[in-house]
């Protein structure tokens, strides 16, 4: 009987022109504090050439709140930095790094609340070595439930700030702050932005005129859901764009990038629409700032989560990571490989989460993108544990990608008519979950028998197998004939 080592991902769908594949493996050795209703971000805070980590949030009981900075040793190992002086009032808020004063280091803005609850917006200046000092002179609105976006809106060479959320008076707002070039901000009045909570926003050049326009999604003070687009005139003056195709959503996330490599920026949005349905939709830009919905995408439809564009397999196109709650019932964290021209396929399923936050970057300096995800997990005993996923991508000399698992997962026979044996290289799998290509869980079993043989009564097709052992979690493809 032939055994197929799926770290090579040899399936009937293999195509010669596709030289890469995607597999992210959880590093179970990390020791990061639990985070409930928190946020995470990565940046090189000490200018040593690697990405450090910050995580905010509360513990499982919502009694203690913590903001923790972790130093990276360059290999993806994170150690808590003691005595940072950062406020622990950070539940329900956001994090943003930016060099606001032009001194070549990353400053820090954190929003959130304490247990009272009082809302906060704390800004810190970095001395270049990762030591942060509070700057209490800034006018930023204390808030939760919104978003923070630093960008140069007026082409003057410094970073301005767009901020949304809910303030201490329980009112939803959208505010723009202009940087004077030294890191001092002032609020811009009379902007056209709709006030949005449960919101997401992103700056991008929608029409290739060399200034940053803005897309904004969320719910206003009248509980009306909106997704709006604003055109920048180049001087930081914005005008609402009418008749856009975007579906109105709240509890949203937005990702922007050139998904089809045609030289313009496309938009990916998830959230809850006016019919209280979850969505995840990709809108293609024609190059002039006019957008059209791409129908037939396979993305799982979520809200209260994240969407990210990222080239996980180093093939020069944008793959997609989607997390969040599916219709308020199940959770998800799915990766879709872009096989060119927006031909997406589900290739990896991570620990399912909602109320999630993601941070993507090369944490171990091996030239691929890793992921850190926090949120409320559905299928794990460690519900609020931050999870670090290492990208196992390596490339052979002939250009064939190999998914380098911590332990090889063996499925046989594969393809199968229904019965399949599943084991890891050194230990038997302790649990198996199998999903179809639209992300539905079709099989789950714990405490497998010594032979790890299972019987599947599923239609013919391709399935994703998530196998957990004592030492690792691995994802592989299975074909049912």
Where are the language model's segments positioned?
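Short glycine/acidic-enriched loop and turn motifs that connect beta-strands
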Residues: 58-62, 113-117, 166-170, 219-223, ...
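C-terminal outer-membrane/trafficking sorting elements
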Residues: 401-481
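Acidic carboxylate motifs that coordinate Ca2+ or other divalent cations, activating on Asp/Glu
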Residues: 48, 52, 103, 107, ...
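A short loop-to-beta-strand structural motif that recurs across blades of beta-propeller domains
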Residues: 66-70, 120-124, 173-177, 226-230, ...
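Blade-edge motifs of beta-propeller repeat domains
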Residues: 19-35, 71-90, 125-143, 178-196, ...
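Beta-propeller blade termini
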Residues: 38-47, 92-102, 145-155, 199-206, ...
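Hydrophobic beta-strand segments that make up the repeating blades of beta-propeller
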Residues: 53-57, 108-112, 161-165, 214-218, ...
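Blade-level signature of beta-propeller repeat domains, shared across WD40, Kelch, NHL, RCC1
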Residues: 357-397
């Amino acid at each position: 009987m032939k055994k197929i080592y799926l770290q090579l991902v040899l399936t009937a769908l293999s195509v010669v022109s596709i030289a890469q594949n995607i597999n992210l493996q959880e590093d179970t050795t990390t020791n990061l504090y639990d985070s409930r209703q928190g946020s995470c971000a990565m940046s090189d805070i000490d200018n040593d050439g690697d990405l450090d980590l910050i995580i905010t949030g509360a513990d499982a009981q919502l009694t203690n709140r913590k903001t923790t900075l972790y130093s990276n040793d360059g290999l993806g190992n994170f150690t808590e930095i003691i005595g940072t002086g950062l406020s622990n009032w950070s539940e329900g808020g956001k994090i943003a790094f930016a060099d606001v004063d032009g001194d070549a280091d990353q400053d820090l803005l954190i929003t959130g609340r304490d247990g009272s609850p009082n809302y906060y917006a704390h800004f810190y200046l970095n001395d270049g070595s990762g030591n942060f000092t509070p700057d209490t002179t800034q006018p930023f609105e204390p808030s939760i439930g919104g978003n923070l976006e630093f960008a140069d809106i007026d082409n003057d060479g410094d970073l301005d700030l767009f901020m949304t959320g809910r303030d201490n008076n329980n009112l939803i707002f959208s505010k723009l702050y202009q940087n004077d070039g030294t890191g001092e901000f002032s609020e811009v009045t009379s902007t056209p932005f709709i006030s949005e909570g449960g919101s997401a926003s992103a700056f991008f050049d929608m029409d290739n005129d060399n200034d940053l326009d803005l897309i904004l999604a969320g719910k206003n003070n009248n509980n009306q859901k909106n997704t709006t687009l604003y055109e920048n005139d180049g001087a930081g003056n914005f005008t609402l764009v009418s008749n856009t195709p975007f579906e109105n959503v709240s509890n949203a996330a937005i990702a922007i990038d050139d998904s089809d490599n045609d030289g313009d920026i496309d938009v990916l949005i998830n959230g809850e629409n006016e019919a209280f349905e979850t969505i995840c939709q990709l809108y293609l830009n024609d190059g002039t700032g006019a957008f059209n919905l791409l129908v037939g995408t396979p993305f799982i439809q979520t809200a209260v989560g994240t969407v990210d564009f990222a080239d996980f397999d180093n093939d020069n196109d944008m793959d997609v990571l989607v997390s969040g709650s599916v219709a308020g019932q199940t959770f998800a964290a799915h990766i879709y490989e872009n096989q060119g021209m927006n031909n997406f396929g589900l290739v990896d399923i991570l620990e399912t989460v909602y109320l999630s936050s993601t941070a993507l970057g090369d944490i171990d300096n091996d030239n691929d993108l890793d992921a850190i995800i926090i949120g409320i997990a559905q299928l794990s005993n460690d519900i609020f544990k931050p999870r670090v996923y290492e990208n196992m991508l390596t490339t052979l000399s002939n250009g064939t990608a190999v998914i380098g698992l911590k332990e090889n997962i063996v499925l046989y026979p594969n393809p199968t008519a229904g019965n399949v044996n599943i084991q890891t290289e050194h230990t038997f799998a302790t649990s198996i979950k199998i999903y179809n290509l639209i992300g539905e869980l079709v099989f789950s079993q714990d405490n497998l028998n010594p032979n790890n043989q299972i019987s599947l009564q599923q239609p013919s097709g391709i399935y994703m197998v998530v196998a957990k052992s004592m030492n690792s979690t691995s994802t592989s493809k299975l074909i049912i004939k």
